[in-house]
Amino acid sequence: MASHQLISAIHLIFLYIHILSTISQASVPPSETFTYVNSGEFGIYIVEYDATYRALSPYSSPFQLCFYNTTPDAYTLALRMGTMRSESLRRWVWEANRGNPVNENATLTLGKDGNLVLADADGRIAWQTNTANKGVVRFQVLPTGNMVLQDAKGNEII
């Protein structure tokens, strides 16, 4: 009988540890979460495809994340490359939602769960990283043009 109680107690301890580890997963600190809304003024530089664009804050020279369009109200989230001091054409080097455009007021959000989501104004998800609850604590655009989601130790999740 005592061994049965001991086994039950051990099971309860493991269940308690499992619940605690599930609850204590890393989450994105409030200072690192963001939501960018596709609205406002367009950028002034000449870009590939003669597109209009809205630059977002994630930036690491010479790369910048932007919403761009060549057709009214059909935007693509893309990474642009070009230097500020150059009059040369700035080029789009990566696109998140190619062939699946979003409209005005679409959002790019890094939530506290660590998932980076591009959603249309009506809530339709156009693109996402599928990194919810995987330990993401920050998003960065690196000087190499890589966009990374990192854990608390600086390791790249994606």
Features from the language model and the residues they span:
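Extracellular/secretory-pathway, disulfide-rich ectodomains
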Residues: 2-158
